[in-house]
Amino acid sequence: MPTTTGVQNDILATTLRILRDQLVDSTFKAVPLMDAVNSLGNVEKVDGGSYIDAPVILTDHSMITQLTTGYEAVSLAVKDPLRTASYSWCDAVAPVVLTRKEELSNKGERAVVRIMEARLKQTMGMFKREIEKQIVAGSSTILTDLQTLNGLDAATGWFEELAFGSQGNTVGGISKASFPTSWQNQVQNGSFAANGLKKMQQLLIDCQQFAPEGDVDLILASPISYGLYKDELQQLERYTSATEMRDMAGKLALTFNGASMYIEPNLGFTGSGGVNKMSMYFLNTRLFNIYFDQDAVFELGDMESISGYSAKSAQIALRMQVTTANLSGHGVLVNAET
């Protein structure tokens, strides 16, 4: 027969799981990149595995044969068999804890639920901050197995400040030097005050020219570069519609050639060389995929007693990774902080 404590734990865990579903949705909407990728249906939930093998688009796959008479031999020459980039999972867990003293000090099930709701929100907020820090700047000290766009400091980071065609990082086990026109990001470098809008326009053109599909639809900007862009527009600035903004958790968004631009507080960092600053990311989110293990999408476990302590906890499990099919459709604006 279940104990009273066991029943209370089950009720509490069930209540928290309902709230957890809402918080997962809020986490996606609060991170512009995750929200954009999710809206395109590029969030993949898979059955475990040790690695993620993500298909990439590097060169043309086969050759076209024109049929003039209809009797021409069809060329079956394959220029590029299916290639995959290989990524390790990022595994993480965080507990939501309630002590016996807190239970006794807050009589009534609703009081205890309120405490756990607040702690669940805190924990999910921590996950959100660490995910964003790592993806954007590679600055998380916790989720270091998660891929980062910062190639200034990480040899496996996606985006470098070097000219297109001369980059040397390794992403997903594939050397960028091996595919200089498809596995390297676009770059523009220089002061925003000098000709920032022209550099943004050129970066957009470069990304569109080399992208195998889609266009730049998301721009993440450091607070300073965002402010400089906003000042430059003056009376010409255009905001996204209320309809497009309603699900973005109140985030302010300008647009540039149809791409939504958001303030990203983790940008504006200086690379380890002490010279270059990452100011803006131009992203083609159609080329992104976010993978989750279907059993660890911020999965909330049961409330269990902690051995040796007068407390109980439920653990939130996360297993995820970020991938891209192509790098040449993305770009960075460097040193646009003045």
Predicted regions and their residues:
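N-terminal low-complexity, intrinsically disordered segments
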Residues: I57-L82
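Core alpha/beta structural scaffold of self-assembling particle/tube/pore-forming proteins
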Residues: P2-I64, A85-T338
